[in-house]
UniProtKB/Swiss-Prot annotation:
It is found in: Cell outer membrane. A lipid is attached at residue 20 (S-diacylglycerol cysteine). It comes from the Bacteria. This is 17 kDa surface antigen. It comes from Rickettsia amblyommatis.
């Protein structure tokens, strides 16, 4: 729990700094960097113990921030909303190996989520490994992640 608290503090500090980005506050790339970094840190925290776990958090945060910044630079709010809803649907209902697609008709951006593996982690939570692929302005980006059901069912 201490590690999760540290991650949340880092994410809050990063969002506060990013909000100082000038007029208009946080931009798409900044949002992608922040969310990618936080997600990467959370993913990295699932591996190792002690100092090894801290290394996992650091590496996950760095890789997530880089990839999230690249993807976020091209995604608009509508893209993110559609992609998030599609991700939830895919992780809840799609069989492993199947693509659940999304498309923004306003700008032509699209992507898909592919659940790859369902498992229970060391604390008994149900989890899924997945691949998220987005095509923004004709350029494809892939990200890999794990999502675990929380005790409240979310």
């Amino acid at each position: 729990m201490k590690l999760l608290s540290k991650i949340m503090i880092i994410a809050l500090a990063a969002s506060t700094l990013q909000a100082c980005n000038g007029p208009g506050g946080m931009n798409k790339q900044g949002t992608g960097t922040l969310l990618g970094g936080a997600g990467g840190a959370l993913l990295g925290s699932q591996f190792g113990k002690g100092k090894g776990q801290l290394v996992g958090v650091g590496v996950g945060a760095l890789l997530g921030a880089v990839l999230g910044g690249q993807v976020g630079a091209g995604m608009d709010e509508q893209d993110r909303r559609i992609a998030e809803l599609t991700s939830q649907k895919a992780l809840e209902t799609a069989p492993n190996g199947s693509n659940v697609e999304w498309r923004n008709p306003d700008n032509g951006n699209y992507g898909y989520v592919t659940p790859n593996k369902t498992y229970r982690n060391s604390t008994g939570q149900y989890c899924r490994e997945y691949t998220q692929t987005v095509v923004i302005g004709g350029k494809q980006q892939k990200a890999y992640g794990n999502a675990c059901r929380q005790p409240d069912g979310q």
